[in-house]
């Protein structure tokens, strides 16, 4: 078992900096909300509405670029670091195209928002926020490419360091643009958008400097030569990345739409649902970090032609995530009301959120299996299955069952928010099972899904 122990240690070493980086990212969102909220509730709402538009768009591009990391890891495992740089350039071109797409989409935000009958003040502040943040889109997506290179060579520390850089820029930038200092007018929630764009540029520049001068990147020499766009590679990578982008989009859109569908049931229900969901999202960072580490390690060992060790990595990753999920689920059940009180002191909200937390605890178990299994499949370059599995599980099962239970008496009397959570648990459990079955299939049949060197190669 020494082997499993070693793999578990390596996974934790890789996952920990990724986890801390995610915590800093979540902290930034939290700080934005609080600092805008100190101006007024409308400013806080503007940041929330603006985020619900730009986040799905930028995550879509991030999903597209997630396909690169296991490939970088594959080249690293094969001792072929010089193949990473030309591939990263193609990633950067794709990122720029995607980033421009996001900017165009955000520039057309008034068209979308005009259909949402917002109060004039909220509408104007939201547009202001979006007009600021859209200038950060190219920096955000280019940073993802550099981050992928670093994580691809099994070096996740910069991700964490740059996370702290972002946090360090975020607070003073918010202070200046939200409240107005150093001759800059107070812009309220709208200033948050400019501050966030500055954070993205600071993170990109810091990462580029880190990679240029740190000895870890000497063999990679990321900026030593220039590569022209190679459309064949870009097309192949888009084919590999698009299913991940779509899978991410299905997930994000599902949660956004559930929140909208719960709105008619009143503020208490929506608030309770948001509390359970937000807490789940925080807990989700644990298995997500392990999933990212698993995809890096599997790519690395496949590059070394050690499919046997890749299988060990997947198994250890799943066991690690499940044992963590069991611990967090038990803590969630024990402290569910205390957790709800951290968010809101309204007794009605606390009681409802507390009961949803019981469901969130169950949800954590399925969630951890599905995210690690999906990470493992990315390592095997099998991304297409993610598209079908998430579409079927989240929308086919999760959404349809959730809606039926929440709003109709078709199966049981209408359950409201609990109905959607039952649907979510069913959908995630389905995804976890299907991802696991697919993973076993690929390992058993040793299908080395190598899209870059031509199509499927059987070992």
From Swiss-Prot:
Protein name in UniProt: Probable multidrug resistance protein NorM
Membrane topology field: Multi-pass membrane protein
Lineage: Bacteria, Pseudomonadati, Pseudomonadota, Gammaproteobacteria, Alteromonadales
InterPro entries, per the entry: MATE_fam, MATE_MdtK, MdtK-like
Keyword Cell inner membrane: yes
Gene Ontology biological process terms in this record: monoatomic ion transport; response to antibiotic
Alphabetically ordered keywords of this record: Antiport, Cell inner membrane, Cell membrane, Ion transport, Membrane, Transmembrane, Transmembrane helix, Transport
GO cellular component: membrane; plasma membrane
Pfam family, one: MatE
Compartments, record wording: Cell inner membrane
Described purpose of this protein according to its UniProt entry: Multidrug efflux pump.
GO MF annotations, alphabetized: antiporter activity; xenobiotic transmembrane transporter activity
Transmembrane segments: 12-31, 46-68, 89-111, 121-143, 155-177, 187-209, 244-266, 281-303, 316-335, 350-372, 385-407, 417-439
Family: Belongs to the multi antimicrobial extrusion (MATE) (TC 2.A.66.1) family.
């Amino acid at each position: 078992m020494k082997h499993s122990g070693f793999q578990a240690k390596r996974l934790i070493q890789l996952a920990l900096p990724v986890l801390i980086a995610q915590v800093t990212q979540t902290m930034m969102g939290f700080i934005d909300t609080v600092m805008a909220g100190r101006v007024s509730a409308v400013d806080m709402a503007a940041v929330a509405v603006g985020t619900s538009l730009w986040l799905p768009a930028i995550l879509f591009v991030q999903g597209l670029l997630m396909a690169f990391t296991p490939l970088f890891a594959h080249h690293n495992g094969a001792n072929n670091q010089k193949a990473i740089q030309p591939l990263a350039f193609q990633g950067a071109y794709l990122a720029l195209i995607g980033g421009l797409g996001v900017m165009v989409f955000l520039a057309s935000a008034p068209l979308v928002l005009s259909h949402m009958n917002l109060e004039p003040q909220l509408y104007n502040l939201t547009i202001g926020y979006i007009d600021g943040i859209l200038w950060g889109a190219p920096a955000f997506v280019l940073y993802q490419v550099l981050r992928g290179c670093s994580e691809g060579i099994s070096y996740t520390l910069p991700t964490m360091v740059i996370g702290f850089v972002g946090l360090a820029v975020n607070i003073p930038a918010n202070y200046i643009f939200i409240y107005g200092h150093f001759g800059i007018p107070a812009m309220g929630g709208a200033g948050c958008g400019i501050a966030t764009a500055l954070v993205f540029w600071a993170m990109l520049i810091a990462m580029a400097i880190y990679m240029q001068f740190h000895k870890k990147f000497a063999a990679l020499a990321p900026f030593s030569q220039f590569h022209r766009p190679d459309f064949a590679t870009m097309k192949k990578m888009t084919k590999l990345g698009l299913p991940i982008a779509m899978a991410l989009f299905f997930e994000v859109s599902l949660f956004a739409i559930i929140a909208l569908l719960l709105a008619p049931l009143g503020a208490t229900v929506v608030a309770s649902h948001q509390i359970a969901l937000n807490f789940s999202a925080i807990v989700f960072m644990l298995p997500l970090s392990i999933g990212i580490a698993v995809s890096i390690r599997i790519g690395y060992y496949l590059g070394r032609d050690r499919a046997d060790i890749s299988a060990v990595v997947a198994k250890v990753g799943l066991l690690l995530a499940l044992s963590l999920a069991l611990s967090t689920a038990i803590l969630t059940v024990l402290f569910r009301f205390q957790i709800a009180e951290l968010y809101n002191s309204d007794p009605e909200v606390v009681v409802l959120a507390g009961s949803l937390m019981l469901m969130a605890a169950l949800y954590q178990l399925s969630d951890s299996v599905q995210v690690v299994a999906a990470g493992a499949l990315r390592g095997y370059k099998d991304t297409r299955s993610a598209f079908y599995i998430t579409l079927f599980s989240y929308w086919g099962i999760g959404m349809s069952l959730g809606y039926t239970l929440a709003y109709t008496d078709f199966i049981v009397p209408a359950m409201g928010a609990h109905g959607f959570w039952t649907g979510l648990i069913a959908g995630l459990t389905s995804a976890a099972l299907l991802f696991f079955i697919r993973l076993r299939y690929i390992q058993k049949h040793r299908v080395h899904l190598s899209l870059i060197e031509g199509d499927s190669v059987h070992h």
